[in-house]
């Protein structure tokens, strides 16, 4: 894509504002009841659409949840502990003070046939990031969802890990996204709504900033965002995938590298998916969520290696 002028530097002050607000985290949340000790994060017990995606296998991604509004799938999210789910803040726009409208379905592979081993839990409250502006494409599009009660862990319901400070994602690192979103713009996932998955490469942030640059004003790619996907389009996240995970495997454990946030259209050429980086917001999550598990490189300090081969299948809102 030919652009006019140079894109702005990545940033926009999002993380600077965020750092000053960390100390203002709600003491009510910090004093919440101690959670039960969970199983090891990021390790499915059973191993074996997203646009251009493919069916996942049952229990392949046991931390993925369906956030439902009035009983209908609305967004995806990821389980962190027995009482906390993480997702995109924009999923609750205009409804932040109406948690009774929402519920969380865990352990479901097919939304049309969730099965007796799935669990459905109400939402107690939602904690959006304090600097999120509620504007489309804004930085800090991340929220924590407090469940009304503790869930029961099983092979179908397990937590995902957050990346520790040793994790870095160089361009062309292959990770995965998953969700129950539309398979094309305006085409919902057909019954029985089987969870879709897609392998996506990380895209250099400067390249992504150029792709989304409009020639004036602040560029939309901020320092707390990651881009991933295929420049040719055809495979991507789509409506209904918002809030779902960008997952990378490190030393046998799956880490939540990012949260599906935004993009232009679905699977359009030169419009890759944009994700909120968990590395950028790890400290905020740790201030609120007691018992969240972090994982990194076994030897410490190393970046993830980009696989020599890849491709796969995809998810967004």
Swiss-Prot record:
GO cellular component, as recorded: extracellular space
Active-site residues from the entry: 90, 141, 242
Disulfide bonds: 75-91, 175-248, 208-227, 238-266
PROSITE patterns cross-referenced by the UniProt entry: TRYPSIN_DOM, TRYPSIN_HIS, TRYPSIN_SER
Residues linked to a glycan: 70
InterPro entries documented for this protein: Peptidase_S1_PA, Peptidase_S1_PA_chymotrypsin, Peptidase_S1A, Trypsin_dom, TRYPSIN_HIS, TRYPSIN_SER
Domain Peptidase S1: 50-290
Pfam family for this entry, one: Trypsin
Highest taxon, organism lineage: Eukaryota
Tissue distribution: Expressed abundantly in the epithelial cells of the airways, including trachea, esophagus and fetal lung. Scarce in adult lung. Expressed at low levels in placenta, pancreas, prostate and thyroid gland.
Keywords annotated in UniProt: Disulfide bond, Glycoprotein, Hydrolase, Protease, Secreted, Serine protease, Signal
Key word Iron present: no
Entry's localization field: Secreted
E.C. designation(s): 3.4.21.-
Position of the signal peptide: 1-32
Any GO molecular function: peptidase activator activity
A biological process from GO: proteolysis
Function comment: Preferentially cleaves the synthetic substrate H-D-Leu-Thr-Arg-pNA compared to tosyl-Gly-Pro-Arg-pNA.
Stated family: Belongs to the peptidase S1 family.
This protein's name: Brain-specific serine protease 4
